[in-house]
Amino acid sequence: MQNFLLATIALSAHHAWALEIDLSNVTSINAAAKTAVEHVLAIYGVGNQSVSIPGIFPDPYYWWEGGLAWDSMVRYWALTGDDTYNDLVHEALLWQTGDDFDYMPPNQTKTLGNDDQSTWALAAMTAAEYGFPSPPDVTWVQLAQNVFNTQIARWHAETCGGGLRWQIFTFNTGYNYKNSISNGNLVQLAARLALYTGNTTYSDWAQKAVEWSQDIGLISEQGQVFDGSSTNINCSTLNHVQWTSAAGTVLTGAVYAANLDRLTSADTWASLVRTLVAGSDVFTSNDILYEVACEPSHNCNVDQLAFKAILVRALANTRDLTFDHQTTASHNESIPISTNGSAVTSGSLHDSINAILRTSARAAAASCSGGADGTTCGSVWTNATWDGSYGLGQELSALEVFLANLPAKVLINANSTTGSPTTSGNGTVTTGGNGSSTSGSAVVNTNDAVVNGKGSTLALVCGLGMAVMILL
């Protein structure tokens, strides 16, 4: 049964106004993000007492999309400072952990895939990195570690030379399919755990998973990320469909791993980042993101309508975690970066990504002109108006692109002086980090330092206490 918001939208006329957003004004961006958040929570059931199981969105949304949504909600809190919904987000992230604290709740076995489980683990990692208030009995990073351990135990070398299957259980359709979203999520989870804990076991697995994807052709030399292949044919033929979700999760994993590369002066991951960004061009039209595999033909399913949110995050991560120069709160100035040691200022990676995120944010805001209040978001951003669609994926994609235009925050990792890097989970997780923790500490806010383009960079803290940016 659809909730009140969706019923209202369906019965409403299309209004002429749209969501207002001024990308030079943080207050305006915050307001746009909050509007999208309110729509997300209305779909969840907040306000009409229809939340039956914490963390789960009603039909037609699958379990994985809850993980994506709560990840966005943690980011919303961290980037806007609005803690209004923190208790609700906290409850949702913990309610779905399952008996073994590994995001395998028994009531999800009918549909549980490796990509679904890891999507929730990535939300837990976001909570750890941003210093989201820790639960009493387990830390966010322990939840992520537990998922990592269950997934590497499923690494299947007997077919295709390795890789994760899409589905966990033999009775689920897709068990005989190895896809980029499942393996890309593993790359991302491993790379983020490596940077957070300092444990090289995780970075080794990130390398192993990405090399396997490259070896069988799921990641092409041109940076394309293809959907997957069947174990029935030993992955000899690929499904060449490209999705923003798979491209996005591999890119985010590469960006985090590139920070580790920097500490050894290696360029392997940074080179992959450059290649993946180039490969993501297929998802843009005049600097506006779109889902190339289904959007032009108007046949995106419920899951696919949320995929753009994952690529938006990845592009924002790439911009914010890969530059060794000062920037501004609104990300609206040309930033010189380095490509293989040569400084470039025109057409730089930063400029091209920033253009996509800013143009897409304006386009997304224009699409948010439906529903009773004239701010419900559609799925197609290239139309400059509402396309008549509505739902969780549309709101999450818009929310992420609005958040991508806010000042970034310093993330926590093994060498941070704030936050909660930990060494173990519930006794079965991988050891890592230096054991120091101050759980629940607030992350460093870089906003004041960068308003005038002076002083601090937007960075991921790493290494010997330095602000790390990768020169791409």
Task: Give the residues covered by each predicted segment.
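Cleavable N-terminal signal peptides of Sec/SRP-targeted secreted and luminal proteins
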Residues: 2-18, 460-467
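CBM-like carbohydrate-recognition segments
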Residues: 19-118, 127, 136, 178, ...
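Short coil/turn linking the two alpha-helices of tandem helical-hairpin repeats
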Residues: 77, 128-132, 194-198, 258-265, ...
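Extended ligand-binding groove/face enriched in aromatic
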Residues: 90-91, 95-190
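Active-site cradle of extracellular carbohydrate-active enzymes
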Residues: 183, 189-197, 201-257
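Oxyanion-binding "anion nests"
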Residues: 249-285
